[in-house]
Amino acid sequence: MKKLFSILSVACLTLFPSCNDWLNVTPQGQIEAEDLYTTTKGCNSVVGGIYYTLTSSALYGQTLSYGLMDVLAQYWDLSTIPDHNYYNATQYDYTDQNVIGTFNNVWSNMYQAITQCNAFIYYSEPYKENIANYDLLLGEVYGLRALAHMELFEIFGPVIHTTADLQKPAIAYRTNYNNVSQGFDTGEVVLQKAADDLNRAL
């Protein structure tokens, strides 16, 4: 019995020494990280991923199109539905956990989209000669980055009554792909950086 076990063990070891090679298969629809920014297909996938993030229910898939923003604009009358998720928002109760959670989701998901834009700009530039329609994709990403920052500025920035209000801290306009904490820019700086991104997009 021991002899049979030894023979089977040796046979298994010699037959399957490199099973990692044939078990390590990339699933269809996925691209290796190192290939993402070096090919047209990869760059198209990255830009598609930015749109996917923006269309999540936390952003334009609901909250920013017909959800919380419409409730705050009083397009929906929820005053008779106190158990609705947005009821406390209609009462301008910004301490409610549902309202706080919704705003936090907008903040984090929008900055996730901005990070995706910054990653595209940072990683794809060395391979731009290999990527079809690179300038078009790059312009699209700069435009999306400006859009995302302007949406955050509109929601979380100070109310602008006079030009002096543009000197107040608003949001962090992130243009670098890193995890370094960044202080808030003034409204004036945010508007200038957004204009710069839109000019690059052209």
Q: How would you name each of these model-derived features?
A:
Residues M1-P27:
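Bacterial Sec-dependent N-terminal signal peptides
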Residues I155-Q192:
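Short coil/linker segments at helix-helix boundaries
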Residues Q28, T40-K41, S56, L68-N98, ...:
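A structural signal for short, hydrophobic/glycine-enriched beta-strand patches
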Residues C19-G67:
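Membrane-proximal, proline-rich intrinsically disordered regions
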